[in-house]
Amino acid sequence: MEVILLSKIKKLGDSGAVINVKSGYARNFLIPKGKAILANKKNIESFEAQRIALEKEKINELLIAQSRAEKLKKINSITILSKVGKEGKIFGSVGVRNIIKEIILLGIKINKKEIRLPNGLLRQVGEHIVVFQPHSKVSINFIVKIIAKN
């Protein structure tokens, strides 16, 4: 029985794929759970129209993410002041929230999920590399400088 997948399913295919599965699997699992629809002419045509709209939306999201990444790339680095104890250790740590606060002050809106700290929380004075990933295909590194506050 041919069905159109509505969502990505492991070992079967991606969303929008027309696949052939056993009729019992389609009737008892895929279709009732909303993971697939029957692949007749009407459904294929309507899904093609939806797929084209989704692809345009994905391309638009990618372009927006690239423009946001370019804005942050122009800034290249941000500076955060923090109280420091002996040996250059910070009281507490600098996390994603602190970094987002500084970036928002520069006029770029970002989400907490878009910042990655490769080495965990920042606990030392100095320069640290942080990853900004607004989209799965767009990722840039920028520098966070932590300076001692007197």
Curated annotation (Swiss-Prot):
Pfam hit, one: Ribosomal_L9_N
Function (record text): Binds to the 23S rRNA.
PROSITE patterns: RIBOSOMAL_L9
Keyword Ribosomal protein: yes
Name recorded for this polypeptide: Large ribosomal subunit protein bL9
Listed PANTHER family: 50S RIBOSOMAL PROTEIN L9 (PTHR21368)
Keywords: Ribonucleoprotein, Ribosomal protein, RNA-binding, rRNA-binding
InterPro entries reported in the protein's UniProt record: Ribosomal_bL9 (IPR000244), Ribosomal_bL9/RNase_H1_N (IPR009027), Ribosomal_bL9_bac/chp (IPR020594), Ribosomal_bL9_C (IPR020069), Ribosomal_bL9_C_sf (IPR036791), Ribosomal_bL9_N (IPR020070), Ribosomal_bL9_N_sf (IPR036935)
One GO location term (cellular component): ribosome
Higher taxonomy: Bacteria, Pseudomonadati, Pseudomonadota, Gammaproteobacteria, Enterobacterales
SUPFAM superfamilies membership: L9 N-domain-like (SSF55658), Ribosomal protein L9 C-domain (SSF55653)
GO molecular function: rRNA binding; structural constituent of ribosome
GO aspect biological process, one term: translation
Domain of life: Bacteria
Gene: rplI
